[in-house]
Design a protein with these regions (language model features):
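Flexible beta->alpha loop and helix N-cap segments adjacent to enzyme active/binding sites
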Residues: 1-219
Length: 219
């Protein structure tokens, strides 16, 4: 997922560790290579149905679970999540949360088993690196760019069980297996890392809910 200088640096470090320093080689599964941050304790079980219902009712949720992502995209562990059916959510994220230009698009995260019903593309996109035309833009306008495209991410239960279960619950409620997914940070900030970062973000940014390793904060 780190297609650039950052990925080259990680590759060089792994090569040095294995080939020069004789460290054992670790075989990463494909879904593991994008979550290379520090591991944090899961404080409690997540009430996926409750969080999904809040999103369906219009809440913007700061979502922190597991290791943080490596690479240029938020891939479901350090994300701001919202309902893609409501155009107002894109405006609110741009104007109030991110404080950036009104026209900036947001990416969707979609269940892999359903992505071809919603996006005109032939292969999964687990690292949010591909852009495709949206097949049903009238149903998910908040993630559809002005040219009808969207840079989407697909997710499986094996790849990210927490975000997968949340989207499953959202689909049960709405019939839509898609969420807005954008990086968990405010204007001029890096993506959040620690639980303390998440609590501070919730206290200072007008999101409706934060889910921090199972702990729920809400207004």
């Amino acid at each position: 997922p780190g297609c650039g200088d950052s990925g080259i640096g990680i590759g060089a470090a792994l090569f040095t560790a294995h080939c020069i320093c004789d460290q054992p080689r670790h075989e990463y599964k494909p879904h593991e290579i994008c979550y290379l941050g520090k591991e944090y304790k899961q404080e409690r079980e997540i009430d996926y149905e409750y969080v999904a219902r809040r999103i369906a009712d219009g809440a913007i949720v700061a979502w922190m679970n597991g290791r943080s992502e490596f690479g240029p995209r938020a891939l479901g562990n350090r994300s701001l999540l919202a309902d893609p059916r409501d155009q107002h959510n894109r405006d609110r994220l741009n104007h109030v949360i991110k404080q950036r230009e009104w026209y900036r698009p947001f990416a969707p995260i979609v269940l892999e088993e359903s992505y071809q019903e919603w996006f005109d593309f032939d292969v999964p996109s687990p690292f949010m690196l591909y852009t495709a035309q949206v097949k049903r833009p009238q149903e998910i306008p908040a993630i559809t760019h002005v040219d009808g495209s969207s840079r989407f991410q697909t997710v499986t239960e094996e790849g990210n069980i927490h975000i997968y279960k949340l989207i499953k619950e959202f689909e049960k409620i709405t019939g839509v297996p898609v969420l807005i997914n954008t990086s968990l940070n405010g204007k001029g900030q890096p993506i959040l890392e620690t639980p303390e970062d998440g609590r501070e973000f919730f206290n200072n940014v007008p999101v409706d809910m934060a889910v921090i390793h199972g702990e729920i904060l809400e207004r």
